[in-house]
Amino acid sequence: MNLNSIPAFDDNYIWVLNDEAGRCLIVDPGDAEPVLNAITANNWQPEAIFLTHHHHDHVGGVKELVEKFPQIVVYGPQETQDKGTTQVVKDGETAFVLGHEFSVIATPGHTLGHICYFSKPYLFCGDTLFSGGCGRLFEGTASQMYQSLKKLSALPDDTLVCCAHEYTLSNMKFALSILPHDLSINDYYRKVKELRAKNQITLPVILKNERQINVFLRTEDIDLINVINEETLLQQPEERFAWLRSKKDRF
């Protein structure tokens, strides 16, 4: 299996998995044009689309792709049923694509119906988990997003986190504002800064590394707790997550 990233809009990535035969899976195609260009250039045969949630920058290209390739099966949560989904999937179910089983994981927070897809080592997490950050809470609660991130953080160490946006640099600037002396965060920030200066992608990331540099996955970390306690005493990791998310929203 080959993993490919297709840039779209200002900072989106549309992920494509293809096998040796050229069959491919497309994840969150917000725009059809760059996907069609890649299909032509690589002689891919699209088999399926995975949708993580209903926002336009993730579903906007579905109609055109299905018109061009009517054999495509479109998997998605209930909230994407009017966006072209032909196979609604929910937490605990599996999608069998390209000879692989993808587990569906419910991750409410960014939207109420948001889902992720996992088939080792690939995690397609839409707008739930970003490198160094997490999605904004447009529909769900901080508690829901905290629980969703806990699910994803519990996946195997070698999981490849395939996020849908290039937000890594801004996320790491925020992380440095919270933990300015953290060695892992500083090292990763320098690496990301160099990549973005060359207009290179920072994704996917390995989950084991992500746990070290993403403050939203470190709500039980003593260094982070001490920083938060300087401003307010919060006993529960969910409360600390909500504090971080609110802080990031104003960053």
Curated annotation (Swiss-Prot):
Keyword Nucleus tagged: no
GO BP terms: namely: methylglyoxal catabolic process to D-lactate via S-lactoyl-glutathione
Family matches, as Gene3D superfamilies? Ribonuclease Z/Hydroxyacylglutathione hydrolase-like
Instruction: Cite the InterPro entries for this sequence.
Output: Clx_II_MBL (IPR035680), Glyoxalase_II_hydrolase (IPR050110), HAGH_C (IPR032282), Hydroxyacylglutathione_Hdrlase (IPR017782), Metallo-B-lactamas (IPR001279), RibonucZ/Hydroxyglut_hydro (IPR036866)
Which terms in the Gene Ontology molecular function aspect does this entry carry? hydroxyacylglutathione hydrolase activity; metal ion binding
Q: In which pathway does it act?
A: Secondary metabolite metabolism; methylglyoxal degradation; (R)-lactate from methylglyoxal: step 2/2
* Top-level taxon of the source organism: Bacteria
Q: Tell me which residues bind Zn(2+) 1.
A: 53, 55, 110, 127
Q: What does this protein do?
A: Thiolesterase that catalyzes the hydrolysis of S-D-lactoyl-glutathione to form glutathione and D-lactic acid.
The UniProt entry's sequence similarity note says: Belongs to the metallo-beta-lactamase superfamily. Glyoxalase II family.
Instruction: Tell me which HAMAP family the record gives.
Output: Glyoxalase_2
Quaternary structure annotation from Swiss-Prot or TrEMBL = Monomer.
What's the protein name? Answer: Hydroxyacylglutathione hydrolase
Source species of the chain: Escherichia coli O9:H4 (strain HS)
List the taxonomic lineage: Bacteria, Pseudomonadati, Pseudomonadota, Gammaproteobacteria, Enterobacterales
